């Protein structure tokens, strides 16, 4: 299966379970691994035969700006739903990294979804 990777996208969002986290934007980092058949696009050189990754990036930024999730797992699930809403995608892996999620460590969640 062919793949498109969008990695290292920094996002600011309200996320977390502690009361002090509910009133401030925090940084998370999004990585997407998108399963898609790229055979046609590799020959045609036409955007219509693939997905517009700039558009997906904008949708992820909008999700971060408008959401107020408690869990990065929930953010990852919604991000996967957005990716899978594209007809040409067949699956995706979403990785969310939350620096300083605990007092001593960075936390990372990896979620895999398929159609």
Write out the residue ranges for each language-model feature.
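N-terminal, polar/charged subdomain of small-to-medium soluble alpha/beta proteins
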Residues: 1-115
């Amino acid at each position: 299966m062919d793949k498109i990777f969008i990695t290292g996208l920094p996002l600011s969002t309200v996320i977390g379970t502690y009361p002090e986290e509910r009133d401030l934007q925090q940084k998370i980092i999004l990585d997407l691994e998108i399963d898609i058949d790229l055979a046609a696009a590799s020959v045609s050189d036409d955007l219509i035969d693939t997905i517009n990754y700039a558009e997906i990036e904008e949708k992820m930024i909008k999700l971060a700006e408008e959401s107020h999730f408690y869990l990065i797992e929930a953010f990852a699930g919604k991000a996967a739903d957005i990716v899978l809403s594209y007809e040409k995608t067949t699956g995706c892996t979403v990785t969310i990294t939350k620096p300083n999620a605990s007092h001593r460590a960075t936390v990372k969640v990896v979620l895999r979804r398929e159609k």
